[in-house]
């Protein structure tokens, strides 16, 4: 509200379960791991892209330079989008930017 943006919640459980069901014959007997974790992120990315397409928006990626440097990002998941506004900032710089913004009036949660 303070940022002037609309906030909605879209559940990923149904598409995630659908993907798991489709993959279950191939994943049968294997321990859950990174594939399932990445699949959750990819479900979010697909849903966000659908909203972006439907309403004519540009989906922004959320990754920063620190995350990309250590591989802490999921292709077609949190890297899904048309522009990365914080892609060239290290995590410490993102945190400093949030503190600077909140000093004016709190809008970004710690």
Enumerate the predicted regions with their spans.
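ATP-dependent adenylation/nucleotidyltransferase module used to activate substrates
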Residues: 1-66, 98
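Mid-to-C-terminal catalytic subdomains of enzymes
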Residues: 57-59, 64-110
